[in-house]
Amino acid sequence: MTQACEEVGPDKVHKRVRRLIAGDRLHLTKGDYKKPIVLSSLSGAEDSPIVLTGTDAVLGTKLKFKKYQATGNALAAAQEAGGEFPGLYYLADNAVLVLRNCQWITIEKLSFDGCWPTAVYLENCQHITLRGLKINGGTFAIGATGVTTRHILVEDCDWVQDPSGNGWELCDALRAGKTIEKELDGPPSKLWRDIDWVEVHGDWLENGKRVDIEHDARAYDGDFFRAWSIAGYVVIRNNIIADAFNGVHFFNQVAESIIDSCSRNVLIEGNWFIRIRDNAIEPEHYAWNWTVRHNVIVDCYLPFSLQMARSGYFYIYGNVAWNVGKPGPDKDEHTRGQFFKFPTDHYADGPHYVFNNSWVLRAPLVKKMRFSNFVHVNNAIDYSDSDPDVTAPFGGNFRDAAPAGYQMEAALLFEAKHFTKAWQYLGIQFDGDVIHHPTFPNDVNAAGFPLGAASLGVSPAFSDMAPGRPDGLKPLTHHPAVDLTLLLPNGDKVTATQAQQNQVGAWQGSDLIKVEDPIFWTYWPGKQDAREVT
């Protein structure tokens, strides 16, 4: 459907947006839009959304991090002084573009520069599309809050949180359809190379550190997409997040009576996460029915943080990753990490499948804690670091004996520094994985981790392990997959892999492994219309 387009400049946009109705298409003309734009209680329709666009419009003050650094640190210190974790999270609603109580709105092809702390903020909104945005700097690229916030589509957006390196060159190359081996050899950002992790996210309880107003970098402690207790139905696809602290981060801290109605139905697919200083994917507290597929991760301290109290029905497959670069200055103690971060205790409402992914790592898969109903099968893993102690799949201390009898108190004390060995009790399965490590599978099995019989300790024979080329992780050797059937939240089952048809790893011939779309994405309201509007 083609919509008539009205043009407006920085001097009149604030009055004009108040009168938008279904079917309006407002084009922001070339210029700098420094004052916040607020869309409040506006409703488009499924077949005629309100569209806000403008290829040459720049929203934000263009404030550089260095100019905001002390302010951000002081605001974090104020939070710390009140007994809270030091951060700018409580100020995320201070955004350049705010949508409040809105439905059926598309924001596309806008640029944001120097929006501290937030570029786009959604509050109690439904059916919002954010497409083709370019966001430079900021603590939060996109923030979302409200238990009625749902059906949010974020696609084809680029965010470089710290542009002091060549992050935008990486984005430009990828958008041009190029590989990025050359760009990855270019200068990384100060956030990746020079800033200590604790200067961004350290606190007194965990790290013995108070906020240093002059030297810290608390304004970087944010995310590409941060959700505070929203209903869900979120799709984040085909975005590029480079030189940032975090990628996608959900909280679910609502009252117990409505916990189950938040952080549900999330699809994260086809994104690039490049030089992420903390986590790429991080659902916290409670979450259900997440699909994470076909993403590319290039250097991330800790890609998957799954520190949830209760969750279920996670499907993580077809992703490729290289963790080969060491972040931070020499004194930084947060440089190696692990691939999965687990909680102290966890209850599973359903399975969590991690299958047919391809990784090149310099750290363990998981070093400590526990997780319930975790199924890790058919993954292909090689290493960029030759030291077997620091890359041992379950941590260098995996041979330590678990306490006799494994009573809960003793178990949790042991697991504070070790990956759990209570696999049968927790429903943990590792099978069909090809992991190129000298301790795998024999030494790992002997240490009390009951790996499946199809686990192999050989090279997956990736054709090219150089970072940045996803097809380089196609294997030269065929290793048959083990059969895997997925349980869906509604009780249905779907075949994911069959030994006679599939191989280990993300690549199945010339394509990444495919499984049926989540039902909520198949029947996404306005899905076809959204494509026609662009």
Can you say where each PLM-predicted feature lies in the sequence?
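Right-handed parallel beta-helix/beta-spiral solenoid domain characteristic of secreted/periplasmic
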Residues: 4-11, 25-30, 34-36, 43-116, ...
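Parallel beta-helix/beta-solenoid
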Residues: 21, 42, 47, 92, ...
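Acidic, glycine- and Ser/Thr-rich low-complexity intrinsically disordered tracts
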Residues: 27, 69-84, 172-223, 372-534
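Structural detector of coil-to-beta-strand junctions
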Residues: 36, 96, 118-119, 141-143, ...
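Residues in short coils/turns that link rungs of repeat/solenoid architectures in beta-rich domains
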Residues: 114, 136-137, 142, 161, ...
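Solenoidal tandem-repeat scaffolds enriched in leucines and small polar residues
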Residues: 147-269, 274, 280
